[in-house]
């Protein structure tokens, strides 16, 4: 099926968004570790980065090749957000992931408007993964909301990362 320009544009936008956020989250992981001395928070954020730069990017690239649409890399990264504390950092990531959900919803909407059910079916994976990513970030945010210090948060994140790994291996 020939893809409309609108569908090609939203796929390219999503491709570039993943490259951008993956790069930004990699920087945030360094901030979590270096500035806030929270290695488990850093690992969580680095995993988000790797998800965007790995799985997400690869899925879009493979789909673009399969359906023969061009992908254009057009992104730049300037990490000018300077969080005062780790809670502010994770709140910023939570807000960013909420924007990603809205972007993915728009991507699905465009596919349906263009009657491109093949691409809509492909986009559903990003809808599901976006729900998971947002819930994971919200969980980490909740740890900050409910803890009295960063050591408690680090311990909770460490346990959560172990739980995620066990679930992933199932």
From Swiss-Prot:
Pfam families recorded: Ferritin
Signal peptide: none
UniProt GO MF annotations: ferric iron binding
Domain Ferritin-like diiron per the UniProt entry, residue ranges: 1-148
Sorted UniProt keywords: Iron
InterPro entries on file: Ferritin-like (IPR012347), Ferritin-like_diiron (IPR009040), Ferritin-like_SF (IPR009078), Ferritin_DPS_dom (IPR008331)
Protein name, per record: Uncharacterized protein UU427
Organism: Ureaplasma parvum serovar 3 (strain ATCC 700970)
